[in-house]
Regions:
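Aromatic-anchored glycine-rich loop motif in surface-exposed flexible loops
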Residues: 1-49, 65-70, 209
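An aromatic- and glycine-enriched ligand-binding surface/loop that stacks and positions planar moieties
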Residues: 22, 30, 48-208
């Protein structure tokens, strides 16, 4: 959709091809990159897209389309030298697990980050109408009825709906990866050790992201 819909045209929109959609995505990002700032004030504009963020998005689009040479060229503008900051000041954090620490919002490794708020006038009664201003994903994938004893060292997690649990195959594929401990949480093991409790949902494995 390139033009606003009206009450008379909204029912006559033709479905276009995926190729046309991706061509438009490429066009939008290519035109936006020169106009975007290299950085934004962290205190007032965190979350706003920057030049590097748009380049990273364009690179991922190229990869999805199989355009490897184009992807390599644009991502080279974002990656920088291994171990050092890129031209926009982004660099990997020393510890992978620090990515998930609440105090590390909008850190140097973050190219694109969505800011959520709990201060909006919204609740679950408005589900699906666009008035939910929090991070619903945490609720969807959180362990159902999660709780832990006061003296437990288990992490503080929101109780959720137990959707999209990590599969056994994913667990097995990642267990030798150095990032494993900060990626998959075995709540089933925590429950067996008396450190936490939850109720398993559909296709429960006990593994949560």
């Amino acid at each position: 959709l390139l033009d606003p819909l009206t009450a008379t045209t909204m029912y006559d929109v033709e479905q276009t091809t995926s190729e046309a959609v991706y061509a438009q995505i490429e066009k939008d990002l290519t035109e936006a990159i020169p106009a975007l700032p290299a950085s934004v004030p962290a205190s007032t504009e965190s979350g706003r897209l920057t030049k590097g963020a748009a380049q990273a998005m364009l690179g991922k689009v190229y990869l999805f389309e199989g355009k490897k040479m184009e992807a390599a060229a644009v991502l080279a503008q974002v990656n920088g030298t291994p171990g050092a900051a890129n031209q926009y000041g982004n660099k990997l954090l020393t510890n992978f697990s620090d990515l998930w620490v609440v105090a590390n919002k909008f850190n140097t490794e973050s190219l694109i980050e969505v800011s959520h708020t709990s201060a909006g006038n919204s609740d679950w009664g408005f589900w699906g109408s666009g008035k939910d201003e929090g991070n619903s994903l945490n609720v969807m994938v959180g362990p159902r009825t999660y709780s832990k004893p006061a003296a437990s060292t288990a992490p503080d997690l929101p109780s959720g709906w137990c959707f999209n649990v990590a599969t056994q195959n994913l667990y097995d594929a990642l267990k030798s990866d150095p990032r494993f401990g900060a990626t998959i949480l075995d709540i089933k093991a925590l429950k067996a050790a008396g450190e936490a409790d939850y109720i398993g949902g559909y296709q429960d494995t006990g593994y949560f992201l």
